[in-house]
Amino acid sequence: MLSLKLPRLFSIDQIPQVFHEQGILFGYRHPQSSATACILSLFQMTNETLNIWTHLLPFWFFAWRFVTALYMTDIKNDSYSWPMLVYMCTSCVYPLVSSCAHTFSSMSKNARHICYFLDYGAVNLFSLGSAIAYSAYTFPDALMCTTFHDYYVALAVLNTILSTGLSCYSRFLEIQKPRLCKVIRVLAFAYPYTWDSLPIFYRLFLFPGESAQNEATSYHQKHMIMTLLASFLYSAHLPERLAPGRFDYIGHSHQLFHVCVILATHMQMEAILLDKTLRKEWLLATSKPFSFSQIAGAILLCIIFSLSNIIYFSAALYRIPKPELHKKET
């Protein structure tokens, strides 16, 4: 019979510094794991196991919702629903890519960086999907058919390209300038989210307009709260920073961050679905639905330029002398 032995785990002082996580002392996988060992680690309690499953399981939930929406939509003729389908598709992509990144990030130093480059690209693709759905369904009455609305998605595309580049670049600073690395990475994700959310901020805190005063408002509020909590957890490394070694396997900040992000996405999806349904008559009377070329063009530009960023920075990994990128790893 075929027997598979679970890989050995390591402590923080047994692996190169590039694999270190703040406040996490034990449960590390071999820094040159095989693909098979990485897959087996899904069924072994390591410090990455729950990072993987907290996005892999939600991927199947969001995929089920996406397939259900596809089945119930007349895709060819219902252009009003296209932005929602694009958004739901991107909400499947980012948790899948994230779970794959966490699964295979221990294959080598460069593989770790490349895995997370792809992760950052997927997050930014989701950011663009959110912007497309917001533009189609959630904009407050006063901002519809304005210059801001006209250029909102175009600038969201630009934001995703810049954000992917900045977040990828930040990984080159991890060892030598960890604080600057963290600041750049947080800002790289914070400003696209802020741009995407401007119509929501206006709607919640200034003037929603008659058509936007509906049941979706509470979901938008919950989405914002969960996103702020996720941002705090990602930045603060709590609770493991206060008690190193106590939360290595269960309860560290990245696991909690994943849970908050998934809950935020769920709340966001419910809000957008409600806006799409409850505001349909008003929106169709006020503005034209996105054309296929507009949606496809935005998505393709995001994918092409984000992949270009990822390829450029991946190639740079092999051009930089090892002592420069990992010089403190001794």
UniProtKB/Swiss-Prot annotation:
Keywords assigned? Cell membrane, Developmental protein, Differentiation, Lipid-binding, Membrane, Oogenesis, Receptor, Steroid-binding, Transmembrane, Transmembrane helix
Where is this gene product found? Cell membrane
* Membrane topology designation: Multi-pass membrane protein
Membrane-side (Cytoplasmic) residue stretches:
1-51, 102-113, 163-186, 275-294
Please list every transmembrane segment annotated in the UniProt record, as residue ranges.
52-72, 81-101, 114-134, 142-162, 187-207, 254-274, 295-315
* Keyword Repeat attributed: no
User: Which organs or tissues contain this protein?
Assistant: Expressed in the brain, lung, kidney, colon, adrenal and lung.
Query: Mind listing the GO biological process terms from this record?
Result: oogenesis
- UniProt miscellaneous comment: Non-classical progesterone receptors involved in extranuclear signaling are classified in 2 groups: the class II progestin and adipoQ receptor (PAQR) family (also called mPRs) (PAQR5, PAQR6, PAQR7, PAQR8 and PAQR9) and the b5-like heme/steroid-binding protein family (also called MAPRs) (PGRMC1, PGRMC2, NENF and CYB5D2).
Q: Name the job this protein performs.
A: Plasma membrane progesterone (P4) receptor coupled to G proteins. Seems to act through a G(i) mediated pathway. May be involved in oocyte maturation.
Protein name per its UniProtKB record: Membrane progestin receptor gamma
